[in-house]
Amino acid sequence: MLKKIKNLIYDNRDRHRILIKLTKGIAMSQSRNIDLVNPHSWEFSGFSQNGEDGIIDFLRNKLSANNQYFIEIGSADGIDNNTAWLLFARSYNGLMIDGNSNLTERAQRMVSSYSIGLRICNMFVTINSMKNIKAISKTLNPDVLSLDIDGNDYFIAQELFLQGFRPKIFVVEYNSTFGPENSITIIPDDEFNYLTKHK
């Protein structure tokens, strides 16, 4: 009974979060002055952290052909990520993967109802799980593939390409404090957990 009440509170809060983020994204997207050679002018954030919604939306509009499909590895609760704008505002289908079972359970309850073509999967992503992702993905050529797992990203990205994935737009988080001139990565670690490593 207590879990049902807790879920009801979370679900109500999440509905409001979605509405607020969608409204914010629409307002920000309408107020942009787009300069084709300045990616900063493409930015807006409804669901993303740093303007990715706008950049992805701008690039998506430039695709000559699209399949309305995304893959998000590191999807969290399905609301705060790089592809939620595509799901809620652009009617995309897709695959959302996260290693945290509590977050994927919340996403399953809230986000899955917005698209019959959305699959939410609880999976701790490692280099060895790429074949599983390949098996459950509807295509190897999604319009957008977003990778944000806060560790092992480089090695996961490398393995995705080795498995044949060819996204039209590929979004990978990086740590900007090292600057664009440096090529730095961690030692691959299949047990890497951002909750314990990023304290």
Where are these regions (language model features)?
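Short charge-dense sequence patches
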Residues: 2-11, 35-37, 53-58, 150-160
